[in-house]
């Protein structure tokens, strides 16, 4: 008998759309904080863009003092400041080192995995999700965010078999990335979702 991948006995508290770096971090953190989390990825594996960034090495962050790093943000600074106060570049470095990824600082205070492999960063994020009980479904394309008035209550998606499904959930995090590299799955889906809200 086939296991249903889109409907669990226990409903989810959080659905995260997009299994890139931001999506995996959001999903893992929500689950670590006791939430039942579903992570939906339209590609066949997670972290595709992470795996190719920095010429395959992944420039994780910058090691400059947090205040200096934050002061460089000009666009959406009002959003960035509280988010960065919660989890800044130093916290990112600690996160990956605790996950077993040895890091090194290079010219310009850029931080890379010592192995020189972006794969290590993507793997650490995926393991973070698994360790915290995140349910991940791949080859599943979210087609819209379901709303009632101004309240979000779930997502519509097409599963890997081509069937349209709905998953109700009180919290949806859209982490679909921008339009920078469509071959990795960054096709701007999040922009469409936002314009529909």
Regions found by a protein language model. Give the residues of each.
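Glycine-rich active-site loop/strand segments that organize a redox cofactor
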Residues: 57-105
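Hydrophobic anchor at the start of a short beta-strand
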Residues: 35-38, 103, 172
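Beta1/beta-strand and adjacent pyrophosphate-binding region of the FAD-binding site
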Residues: 7-22
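Mobile, glycine/GP-rich and aromatic-enriched active-site lid/loop segments adjacent to catalytic centers
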Residues: 98-127, 131
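Predominantly flavin-linked oxidoreductase catalytic cores and closely associated redox partners
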Residues: 52, 119-120, 124-197
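Small-residue (primarily alanine) positions within well-ordered alpha-helices
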Residues: 19-22, 26-31
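A short, basic/flexible loop-to-alpha-helix module at the beginning of a structural domain
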Residues: 1-11, 163-164
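Glycine-rich FAD pyrophosphate-binding loop
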Residues: 15, 31-55
């Amino acid at each position: 008998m086939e296991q249903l991948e889109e409907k669990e006995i226990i409903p989810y508290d959080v659905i995260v759309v997009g299994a890139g770096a931001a999506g995996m971090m959001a999903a893992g953190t929500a689950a670590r904080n006791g939430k039942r989390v579903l992570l939906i990825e339209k590609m066949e594996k997670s972290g595709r863009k992470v795996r190719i960034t920095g010429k395959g090495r992944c420039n994780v962050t910058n090691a400059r003092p947090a205040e200096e790093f934050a002061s460089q943000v000009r666009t959406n600074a009002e959003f960035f400041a509280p988010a960065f106060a919660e989890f800044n570049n130093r916290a990112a470095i600690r996160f990956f080192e605790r996950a077993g990824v040895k890091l090194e600082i290079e010219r310009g205070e850029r931080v890379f995995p010592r192995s020189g492999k972006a794969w290590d960063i993507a793997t650490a994020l995926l393991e973070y999700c698994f360790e915290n009980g995140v349910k991940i479904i791949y080859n599943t394309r979210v087609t819209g965010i379901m709303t009632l008035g101004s309240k979000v209550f779930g997502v519509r998606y097409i599963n890997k078999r081509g069937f349209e499904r709905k998953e109700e959930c009180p919290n949806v995090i859209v982490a679909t990335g921008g339009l920078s590299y469509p071959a990795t799955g960054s096709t701007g889906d999040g922009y469409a979702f936002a314009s529909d809200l």
